[in-house]
């Protein structure tokens, strides 16, 4: 079992399979042909307001952050004068090989490997497969060299980020009701200090696209695309399965008391009422539609179960990936011990002393506390499901790892940015964006110079 691996060894087989699928589609539906339909669809896509906003914001902010990281490396340098690991002597090529990116690149090039059952030994089994599998495919198509994999990873996360921003724009446009608010939501999320990870070879971009894509299609009762995005979320990161909880709350929210359901901004809504007006028709439940909804809500959990099945085949333990997190400093302690520890430090040492001793932890906690503090306002304006999305994605990791990566986790809390876009007056938004952008510059400097912001 320990030598089993899943690998793509020949990209030409993938391209041949794509050609077969294309030919089959042409035989099944000859008109319009792909050559006729594709340019029209591309023009429609590129002319959409969501696409323009996502491209404009996504590309400009990611390129700017990479430039900040590059010049931080050249001017500030690394701790101890050298990086902990180096993939290439060229700092531009080496720029994206930071922290977890090295593990994703290892999986993409060598596959999953399992040597020991010792939970204190770091192994790549803890990293979920969606990003490294896509990285392997694209990297091999681009030539299979290290720069090719670096370029593939950067391109993948850029594309995923743009898709996530486009979905955020569409969701904000439908739920908040104005293009100005949609633009604000996109810009606020992209400028957020911990949005630095959207340009790194990390899973944040893919998770953002999957989570918002699932939510967008789910509330419109477009079950198939919602389920597809949901499975992707489950295959992207360990907490992907938690998306099933707010999706389930979206389904039951019409039956909840008004005080509990909260706002209805992100609730179920179909702009085409003749298609499916509700899960309730004529006073009775549409059981077929309800079944589709519950099955779709389970899709993120299905994605995690698929990876559990794979790890069971590889290691004999379906949750080996969960046990392996202990080697990264994640073991369940509970929220109260975490709160008590930090509270004791603050009361005995003071904020200044604590900040000077653990500045990165304090920075991470600032991000976590920011989004958690907005849970109640999000609930009151956007709904219980939106608030639950924040809680189930923030509290369990904090209970298991404290401040570790808490800021990074806060970056994908998209309901927070929808709330900010709806609550912050238009005249004040530039100030929020400017403050966020300065913070992201700091985070980029720390991350790309190998300070412990991961």
Predicted ranges, named:
Residues 147-151, 168-191, 209, 225, ...:
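Transmembrane-helix signature of polytopic, membrane-embedded enzymes
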Residues 176-179, 214-225, 255-258:
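Membrane-interface transmembrane helices that cradle and orient dolichyl/undecaprenyl
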Residues 19-84, 288-299, 432:
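Start-transfer (signal-anchor) and selected internal transmembrane alpha helices
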Residues 199-206, 406:
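Short acidic/glycine- and proline-prone juxtamembrane loop motifs at membrane-interface regions
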Residues 98-144, 337-346, 397:
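Short hydrophobic/aromatic helix or loop-helix immediately within or flanking a transmembrane segment
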Residues 61-82, 96, 125, 232-233, ...:
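Membrane-lumen/periplasm interface segments of specific transmembrane helices
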Residues 190, 194, 211-216, 224-251, ...:
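Membrane-interface alpha helices of multi-pass inner-membrane proteins
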Residues 135-137, 152-175, 370-374:
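Transmembrane-helix motifs of polytopic, lipid-linked glycan transferases
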